[in-house]
């Protein structure tokens, strides 16, 4: 009997509050008619809210949709993707042209016999084909990592409803972590390898600067300042001439092939370094995303168990209330 009495009391309280609100509104309308007699036939019309007026820029949900879309953009992955694309493009483009210029310099000045540098020409041609493959692979791989960043960001921030992820998705994220780590180590080797031609061209350029210096002009020792490319191992020791000295070496340094190849090798080395930084950035992002997915999946499992227990508790309480009402 007690619950029924409490319910009746609550209903009486609500009805009294509604009567107070209605009487207050009627008093306000009566006061308005008393102050303005000509408005007795006027019917009270509520003023529409500004939010009720739908416009092209204030459509319901438009602003929230834009905020949700911007919130789902993985900005860290986007920056890493742009850096990776830029580094790979610089390395592949500049490296390809610089290798072609290096072959031209060797054929014209250091190895006039084609058979002496035939192996080097084949290796450089193979490296140019490898550059094509590297550019294609990293273009695709960068897009895949960016898509994985969108997936992880949407899953963690619950942008499309409740948190949803699968064991396969977490396994794919872990696989990307391992693959990015391997590629990062490989690109460290590429970065070190790309510094070798920069070192070689720098030695030739510094030797030319010594020849051009005022202390060396007019002396007989200028013709004794030489550069022997055979000591770097890129052409065999029986290659002719293999060694260039004096004014001939200065003429090589003044050619467009040498100038372009030297600076393009520097840019290619910088591009390889940028790619290494981008892969390290990707590795940090993928590791954190994988950890977030793992923790979020555990939290989701805990919330599911908790919701199930609360539902069972509510069912028990509802059944106990029904039994109590049946007894009363």
Swiss-Prot record:
Tissue expression: Widely expressed. In the brain, expressed in neurons and oligodendrocytes.
GN (gene name): Gpm6b
Protein name: Neuronal membrane glycoprotein M6-b
InterPro entries: Myelin_PLP, Myelin_PLP_CS
Keyword Manganese: no
CC per GO annotation: membrane raft; plasma membrane
Chain ranges passing through the membrane: 71-91, 130-150, 176-196, 265-285
Family, per entry: Belongs to the myelin proteolipid protein family.
Function: May be involved in neural development. Involved in regulation of osteoblast function and bone formation. Involved in matrix vesicle release by osteoblasts; this function seems to involve maintenance of the actin cytoskeleton. May be involved in cellular trafficking of SERT and thereby in regulation of serotonin uptake.
